[in-house]
């Protein structure tokens, strides 16, 4: 929420929390496609019509944790794929000549964050090329391989119960990276995106 507080001071937040947000009635668009992310789009719709979306620090919402890492993975894939599809639907908001710093905030906070998973394969390839050029650097890709293997073990362990922290953190990071890849494939593939009933809080 710290980032959203900064965005509010800077002008407008670029995405609302689906569990806890409100929008003015005359800005609400009932015709908005159901398979897109309405909470994310609410901020974009407000900005398009000359309003801004803000984060209220005094608002408190308790959100239960996902029951397992697999559920968290599915949640990440779903929300990211819907977010990407929504951003494409409202892509003109990325035009800095029309929407100024909001376009920059939208690209840096959303699009760049949804591309973070690309750093994993890029790092592995880069380390492999470095080691190929100079054998002294072979420990680096080897360490990366071990880290990824530990992540897989942590993810697998979470299906049996609570994983030790040394395994849980790499498992969570790996699940997030794989979810990023899966979300992009789903969004680019044009597959229908699930519509679900939000958890009551």
Regions found by a protein language model. Name each.
Residues 6, 10, 110, 114-118:
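Loop-to-transmembrane-helix entry motif
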Residues 1-36, 172:
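Long helical/loop segments within the catalytic core of UDP-sugar-dependent glycosyltransferases
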Residues 63, 113-192:
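Membrane-embedded multi-pass helical conduit in multi-pass membrane proteins
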Residues 34-38, 43-109, 178, 182, ...:
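Catalytic donor/gating beta->alpha subdomain of glycosyltransferases that bind UDP-sugars
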Residues 2, 6, 86, 187:
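Residues that form generic nucleotide/phosphate-binding pockets
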Residues 51, 195-201:
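Membrane-proximal intrinsically disordered regions of secretory-pathway and membrane-system proteins
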């Amino acid at each position: 929420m710290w980032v959203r507080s900064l965005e509010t001071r800077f002008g407008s937040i670029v995405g609302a929390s689906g569990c806890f947000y409100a929008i003015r009635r005359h800005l609400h668009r009932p015709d908005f496609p159901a398979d897109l992310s309405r909470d994310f789009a609410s901020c974009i719709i407000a900005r398009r019509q000359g309003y801004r979306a803000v984060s209220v620090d005094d608002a408190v919402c308790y959100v239960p944790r996902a029951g397992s890492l697999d559920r968290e993975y599915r949640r990440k894939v779903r929300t990211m794929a819907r977010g990407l599809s929504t951003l494409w639907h409202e892509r003109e908001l990325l035009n800095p000549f029309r929407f100024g710093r909001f376009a920059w905030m939208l690209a840096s906070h959303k699009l760049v964050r949804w591309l973070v998973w690309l750093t994993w394969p890029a790092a592995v390839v880069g380390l492999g090329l470095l080691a190929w050029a100079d054998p002294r650097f072979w420990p680096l890709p080897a360490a990366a391989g071990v880290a990824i293997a530990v992540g897989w073990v942590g993810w697998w362990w979470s299906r049996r119960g609570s994983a030790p922290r040394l395994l849980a953190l790499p498992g969570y990071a790996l699940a997030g990276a794989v979810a990023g890849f899966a979300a992009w494939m789903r969004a680019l593939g044009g597959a229908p995106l699930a519509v679900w009933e939000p958890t009551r809080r």
